[in-house]
From Swiss-Prot:
This protein's encoding gene: Gata6
Protein name: Transcription factor GATA-6
Glycyl lysine isopeptide (Lys-Gly) (interchain with G-Cter in SUMO2) cross-link, renumbered residues: 423, 467, 478
Matching SMART domains: ZnF_GATA
Zinc finger map (GATA-type): 384-408, 438-462
Taxonomic lineage of the native organism: Eukaryota, Metazoa, Chordata, Craniata, Vertebrata
Length: 587
C-alpha cells in the first residue's frame, strides 16, 4: 500500500513526563517529511531511551491504554494483548518493539504512543497499544489487572496506510485478533511473521467481501476470515464469522452461550447430511470474539491455554471439525441427528429404494438359484410360437428368446424366414387320382402316370410302350390287372448253400444262378457233397492243358445237371437260355 507524506504516525507523550519529551525522550517527535519504516522507527525509539528509567537502564516503552485520551465512540474498543517474552526478544534485546530488556523498569505509566492515522482522520478511533510491563516491572503491584483494556474496534476502520509495510507494528486486523485471542498467553508472535503467513492461508479471504457492512461505510478488513456464501458465519457474524457490527448493530448477532467458544453450531440440514462450511476458522480462541447487540464491542476472552493456534490449525477435509481442547461447555456436536427414515430424492432414485424403505424390517427376498429355474422349466409346458407344437425332440429359441420347435427353429435358421404354418397337402397316389384317365387305353389305375408328346396323361404301360417303340400301344394289349414283377426276399442260408454252384467259371451266368433252382434240382445227399464237387471241378480245370477241350465230366454230379453235356461255350449258352430261370436272369 502506498504511503503518503502524512500517512505515518506521530509519536506523542502524555502524562507527567510530557515536559521532557525533547530529544532525550524514547520516542522523539519527527516530522512526517519522509515515510519511515517501522523497523527503523522502533529501533531508534528503543535505543535512545537509556536515561529515562529510574535505574538508568535502557528500556522500550510500549503504549499504555489511556481511556480518557481516546475520543472514539462509547463502547467501541478492541482487545490487544501485550508482547510477551519470546526468543526473538531475547536475541534482539531492546530492539524488539514492546519488549523490555533485563533489569529495566518503567518510571512512569502515563506514557503512551498515539498512532494518528492521517488517512483515517475522519474516524475518532485510535490504535492504542497496551503496556507489557505489568508483569516484569517492579511496579507491577501498582498496575491493576484491568490494564488489558480494549482498543477501538478495527472493524470500523479500513486498512491503515502503513498496513502493508514490511515490519510494521500491525499488518492486518487478523494479527490484532490473534493477539487479542492470546491476551494472557506468554507467547510472542512477531507481527512481521504473522503478516507473511496470513496470505498463504486458504481460509482467510481478501478484503471487501465480508458478509456484514460496518456503520462507518468502510469495507471489511482484509485480515478477517470471510464466511462462505452457503453457510452462516460461525460466531453469529462476529470476528470469526467475517465482520463486526458498528454502533448501530447492523450486523450484530447474539453471542453463543459459551464465552470461550462463541461460535454456534450450524443449523441442521433437511436430510441430516454433513455440510462443509467455508468460513469456519478451526482454532479455539483464534477468532474468540463475539458481537454484542448494541455496543458492538469485542469481548475480552481467550484463556492462557488457548494460545495462538489459528495459524497452525488446518482445516479438515471430511466436513467435520475436531478440536484439541476438551472443555467445551455448550458446544453441540457438528453432525447433528442421524439419518432420518425419509430418504432424500436423488438422481438414482428407483422403485427398489422405495420398496426397501417401506420394508425396513422385512427381510430381503432370497434370489432363486438355477435349480429353481430348471424345475420351473420342467414343470411348465412349452409351446412353439410358430406352429403351436408342444412336443419336439429339441427346443430352440429365436432371436427374441421365444421357444421354437425343432422343425421351425431349423427352418428359420436355414432360410432366415419363419416356417410356413400351412402345411402342403399330401400327394394323393397316382393310381387313385380322381378324374385322371389314360389318353390311350382310358384306364384309371396305374402305378405311374406319364405324359405323352402332346402333354396328355397316359398310364405307365402306354407311356413306356410309346417310349420304346415310338407308336401308341395297341388296345388289344390292355389288361384288366396290372402285371407287377414279383420280388421275393433272398434267403441268406440258401444263398450260402448254393455258393458252390456259383463258383463255376465256365458259364457267363454262373454268378447269377438262382438259389431257388438249386433247391429244386438238388437232393439232400447231393447238398452235403457240394463242397467236394467244387474242389473236383477246380482240379479238372487245372489238369486240362488244352483250352479247346472243354469236356468236363462231373463225377457224382448227374443229379445236379441231369442230361447236361457241355462240349463248347456255344452249347452252354444255348442250354442255359432254354431253362425257365434264364429269362429272369438275363432280363
Amino acid at each position: 500500500m502506498a504511503l503518503t507524506d502524512g500517512g505515518w504516525c506521530l509519536p506523542k507523550r502524555f502524562g507527567a513526563a510530557a515536559a521532557d519529551a525533547g530529544d532525550s525522550g524514547p520516542f522523539p517527535a519527527r516530522e512526517p517529511s519522509s515515510p519511515l519504516s517501522p523497523i527503523s522507527s522502533s529501533s531508534s525509539s528503543c535505543s535512545r531511551g537509556g536515561d529515562r528509567g529510574p535505574c538508568g537502564a535502557s528500556n522500550c516503552r510500549t503504549p499504555q491504554l489511556d481511556t480518557e485520551a481516546v475520543a472514539g465512540p462509547p463502547g467501541r474498543s478492541l482487545l490487544l494483548s501485550p508482547y510477551t517474552s519470546h526468543p526473538f526478544a531475547a536475541a534482539h534485546g531492546a530492539a524488539a518493539p514492546g519488549v523490555a530488556g533485563p533489569g529495566s523498569a518503567l518510571s512512569t505509566w502515563e506514557d503512551l504512543l498515539l498512532f494518528t492515522d492521517l488517512d483515517q482522520a475522519a474516524t475518532a478511533s485510535k490504535l492504542l497499544w497496551s503496556s507489557r510491563g505489568a508483569k516484569l516491572s517492579p511496579f507491577a503491584a501498582e498496575q491493576p489487572e484491568e490494564m488489558y483494556q480494549t482498543l477501538a474496534a478495527l472493524s470500523s476502520q479500513g486498512p491503515a496506510a502503513y498496513d502493508g509495510a514490511p515490519g510494521g507494528f500491525v499488518h492486518s486486523a487478523a494479527a490484532a485478533a490473534a493477539a487479542a485471542a492470546a491476551a494472557s498467553s506468554p507467547v510472542y508472535v512477531p507481527t512481521t511473521r504473522v503478516g507473511s503467513m496470513l496470505p498463504g492461508l486458504p481460509y482467510l479471504q481478501g478484503a471487501g467481501s465480508g458478509p456484514s457492512n460496518h456503520a462507518g461505510g468502510a469495507g471489511a478488513h482484509p485480515g478477517w476470515p470471510q464466511a462462505s456464501a452457503d453457510s452462516p458465519p460461525y460466531g453469529g457474524g462476529g470476528a470469526a464469522g467475517g465482520g463486526a457490527a458498528g454502533p448501530g448493530g447492523a450486523g450484530s448477532a447474539t453471542a453463543h452461550a459459551s464465552a470461550r467458544f462463541p461460535y454456534s453450531p450450524s443449523p441442521p440440514m433437511a436430510n441430516g447430511a454433513a455440510r462443509d462450511p467455508g468460513g469456519y476458522v478451526a482454532a479455539g480462541g483464534a477468532g474468540a470474539g463475539s458481537v454484542s447487540g448494541g455496543g458492538g464491542s469485542l469481548a475480552a476472552m481467550g484463556g492462557r491455554e488457548h494460545q495462538y493456534s489459528s495459524l497452525s490449525a488446518a482445516r479438515p477435509l471430511n466436513g467435520t471439525y475436531h478440536h484439541h481442547h476438551h472443555h467445551h461447555p455448550t458446544y453441540s456436536p457438528y453432525m447433528g441427528a442421524p439419518l432420518t427414515p425419509a430418504w432424500p430424492a436423488g438422481p438414482f432414485e428407483t422403485p427398489v429404494l422405495h420398496s426397501l424403505q417401506s420394508r425396513a424390517g422385512a427381510p430381503l427376498p432370497v434370489p432363486r438359484g438355477p435349480s429353481a429355474d430348471l424345475l420351473e422349466d420342467l414343470s411348465e409346458s412349452r409351446e412353439c410360437v410358430n406352429c403351436g407344437s408342444i412336443q419336439t425332440p429339441l427346443w430352440r429359441r429365436d432371436g427374441t428368446g421365444h421357444y421354437l420347435c425343432n422343425a421351425c427353429g431349423l427352418y428359420s435358421k436355414m432360410n432366415g424366414l419363419s416356417r410356413p404354418l400351412i402345411k402342403p397337402q399330401k400327394r394323393v397316389p397316382s393310381s387313385r387320382r380322381l378324374g385322371l384317365s389314360c389318353a390311350n387305353c382310358h384306364t384309371t389305375t396305374t402305378t405311374l402316370w406319364r405324359r405323352n408328346a402332346e402333354g396328355e396323361p397316359v398310364c405307365n404301360a402306354c407311356g413306356l410302350y410309346m417310349k420304346l417303340h415310338g407308336v401308341p400301344r395297341p388296345l388289344a394289349m390292355k389288361k384288366e390287372g396290372i402285371q407287377t414283377r414279383k420280388r421275393k426276399p433272398k434267403n441268406i442260408n440258401k444263398s450260402k448253400a448254393c455258393s458252390g454252384n456259383s463258383s463255376v467259371p465256365m458259364t457267363p451266368t454262373s454268378s447269377s444262378s438262382n438259389s431257388d433252382d438249386c433247391t429244386k434240382n438238388t437232393s439232400p445227399p447231393t447238398q452235403s457233397t457240394a463242397s467236394g464237387v467244387g474242389a473236383s471241378v477246380m482240379s479238372a480245370v487245372g489238369e486240362s492243358a488244352n483250352p479247346e477241350n472243354s469236356d468236363l465230366k462231373y463225377s457224382g454230379q448227374d443229379g445236379l445237371y441231369i442230361g447236361v453235356s457241355l462240349s463248347s461255350p456255344a452249347e452252354v449258352t444255348s442250354s442255359v437260355r432254354q431253362d425257365s430261370w434264364c429269362a429272369l436272369a438275363l432280363a
